[in-house]
């Protein structure tokens, strides 16, 4: 897209894993890679701005329920059984699905965020991470403390 218009029949020159330019007549020796884009689409990566990625594991669990009934009677009790390892693998599944669909970055608010960060780094996807907080409640300070720790450790954003 140039000046807000879709452009067609372009070459993409890649250098050090980054798009360098769109040359009209590329010379192979000048670039690490040239992608001939005939019958293809190149577009920026998508960003999912509200996720609870490890919840992919709850897909189709107790469908067709009212939100609060679903949360209070199904999801929140199930989340009490989550741990670092389960969140890592749930996040890994979510990232495979995101990347396959063109998502290259996400914003997640859930729990066990160190596990989510490890999975994101391994998958090569970028993310902003925070411990999810829904009101302060009885465990509010714990969630705030977890977010401060994420920030101090530098895992509030995945490194990919």
Label for each model-derived stretch:
Residues 86-93, 146:
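A non-catalytic, amphipathic alpha-helix used as a structural packing/dimerization or gating element
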Residues 96-104, 159-160:
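Short, surface-exposed connector motifs at secondary-structure boundaries
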Residues 74-88:
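Active-site mouth loops of central-metabolism enzymes
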Residues 115-160:
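Metal-coordinating catalytic core of metallo-dependent amide/deamination hydrolases
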Residues 1-30, 40-41:
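N-terminal metal-binding scaffold of metallo-dependent hydrolase/deaminase domains
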Residues 106-116:
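Divalent-metal (often Zn2+) His-rich catalytic cores of metallo-beta-lactamase-fold enzymes
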Residues 104-105, 126:
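Short acidic/polar active-site loop segments enriched in Thr and Asp
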